[in-house]
């Protein structure tokens, strides 16, 4: 069946485009007083089966042609959109391809202009160290080992490994002609912006073989002088720096935890710090026939390497958390308190665990319901 066009037929098809109702109506147009339904049935009975089938097929053909034209318009619309997208991608691809081609041609021209120089450069031994220019090191690098450039390595240490440590060289002097230099370097530990501390070293350094010969302490902040006394007595420079950095980290977390507890409890209790901010005291007054005071003390102690009670082989600071509880001046059993403290911190972590400890000790009515 051809749905494309009817213009090629030699015979007259004007009647074939009439609908079924139009064809029936032409036989009895003048009989207006006859019932319509009965008239249609009578007229259909006058048509043979072939004529009825032809009329139905013509109606289906017209509907299909209309649907076909609609689909062709949609196809044309999508083709136009696709052509626009392809044109834009082609332009971008041409630009990228041209850049790659131009770079390749430049490399060919450089290598072909003086091939002997490239071979001689490979044969010549290049000495690369931390003071070598970064671009020169990259040109001569054929392995996957870390870069030696001192500035690049220091930037990674500063930005990623020790982001809260500021290092500044105060002075640099050469001693005689043996390659030894005296550096005065200041280290500032500033994780806790409200209470930072500094330590200044005098170092005798031999750059030729990258050796730290000896070092001295010129100045140290008073807020860590007593705490770091045993650590600095070890005379291990790397151990001292790493331990002080970890001490600053733990101290900053302790300050944040105590401040969070104070903000949560200050409306219903009285909170204050003691023992150089190593202990938080929380007091609540309740009425049980008479006024009774519940006092909770949270101790957050940081022990440095070399202090008493610290494992011998441990070179990093450690923290120990304990609590003490009084009610009406009478102290509770410490063994039971230690078990409660250990269990809640193990279950919830330090921050949430201490919050639950405060609720259990200061607001027991919350758990009695």
From Swiss-Prot:
CDD domains linked: DRWD-C_ScCTF19, DRWD-N_ScCTF19
One GO CC annotation: kinetochore
Coiled-coil annotated residue ranges, if any: 51-87
Superkingdom classification of source: Eukaryota
Compartments, record wording: Nucleus; Chromosome, Centromere, Kinetochore
UniProt KW keywords: Cell cycle, Cell division, Centromere, Chromosome, Coiled coil, Kinetochore, Meiosis, Mitosis, Nucleus
GO biological process: attachment of spindle microtubules to kinetochore; cell division; chromosome segregation; establishment of mitotic sister chromatid cohesion; meiotic cell cycle; mitotic spindle assembly checkpoint signaling; protein localization to chromosome, centromeric region
Stated role: Component of the kinetochore, a multiprotein complex that assembles on centromeric DNA and attaches chromosomes to spindle microtubules, mediating chromosome segregation and sister chromatid segregation during meiosis and mitosis. Component of the inner kinetochore COMA complex, which connects centromere-associated proteins and the outer kinetochore. COMA interacts with other inner kinetochore proteins to form the inner kinetochore constitutive centromere-associated network (CCAN), which serves as a structural platform for outer kinetochore assembly.
Complex and partners: Component of the heterotetrameric kinetochore subcomplex COMA, which consists of AME1, CTF19, MCM21 and OKP1. The COMA subcomplex is part of a larger constitutive centromere-associated network (CCAN) (also known as central kinetochore CTF19 complex in yeast), which is composed of at least AME1, CHL4, CNN1, CTF3, CTF19, IML3, MCM16, MCM21, MCM22, MHF1, MHF2, MIF2, NKP1, NKP2, OKP1 and WIP1. COMA binds the centromeric nucleosome-binding protein MIF2, and to the outer kinetochore MIND subcomplex. CTF19 interacts with the CTF3 complex subunits CTF3, MCM16 and MCM22 as well as CHL4 and IML3.
Annotated family: Belongs to the CENP-P/CTF19 family.
Note: Present with 1254 molecules/cell in log phase SD medium.
UniProt protein name: Inner kinetochore subunit CTF19
UniProt organism field: Saccharomyces cerevisiae (strain ATCC 204508 / S288c) (Baker's yeast)
């Amino acid at each position: 069946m051809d749905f494309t066009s009817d213009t090629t037929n030699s015979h007259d098809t004007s009647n074939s485009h009439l609908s079924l109702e139009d064809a029936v109506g032409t036989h009895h147009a003048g009989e207006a007083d006859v019932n319509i339904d009965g008239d249609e049935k009578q007229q259909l009975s006058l048509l043979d089966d072939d004529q009825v089938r032809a009329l139905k097929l013509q109606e289906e053909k017209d509907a299909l042609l209309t649907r076909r034209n609609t689909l062709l318009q949609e196809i044309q619309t999508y083709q136009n959109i696709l052509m626009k997208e392809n044109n834009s991608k082609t332009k971008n691809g041409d630009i990228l391809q041209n850049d790659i081609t131009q770079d390749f041609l430049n490399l060919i021209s450089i290598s072909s202009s003086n091939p002997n120089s490239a071979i001689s450069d490979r044969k010549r031994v290049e000495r690369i160290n931390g003071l070598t220019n970064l671009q020169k090191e990259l040109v001569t690098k054929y392995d996957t080992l870390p870069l030696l450039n001192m500035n690049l390595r220091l930037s990674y240490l500063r930005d990623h490994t020790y982001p809260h440590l500021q290092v500044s060289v105060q002075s640099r002097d050469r001693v005689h002609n043996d390659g030894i230099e005296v550096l005065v370097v200041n280290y500032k530990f500033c994780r806790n912006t409200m209470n930072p501390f500094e330590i200044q070293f005098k170092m005798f350094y031999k750059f030729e073989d990258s050796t730290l010969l000896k070092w001295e302490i010129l100045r140290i902040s008073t807020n860590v002088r007593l705490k770091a006394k045993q650590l600095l007595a070890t005379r291990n420079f790397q151990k001292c720096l790493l331990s002080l950095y970890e001490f600053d980290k733990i101290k900053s977390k302790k300050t944040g935890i105590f401040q969070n507890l104070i903000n949560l409890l200050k409306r219903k209790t009285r909170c204050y710090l003691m023992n150089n901010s190593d202990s938080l005291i929380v007091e609540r007054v309740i009425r049980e026939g008479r006024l009774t005071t519940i006092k909770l003390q949270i101790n957050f102690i940081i022990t440095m390497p070399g202090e008493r009670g610290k494992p011998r082989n441990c070179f990093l600071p450690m923290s120990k958390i304990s609590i003490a509880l009084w009610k009406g001046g009478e102290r509770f059993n410490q063994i039971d308190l230690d078990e409660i403290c250990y269990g809640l911190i193990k279950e919830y972590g330090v921050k949430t665990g201490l919050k639950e400890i405060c609720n259990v000790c200061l607001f027991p009515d919350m758990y009695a319901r």
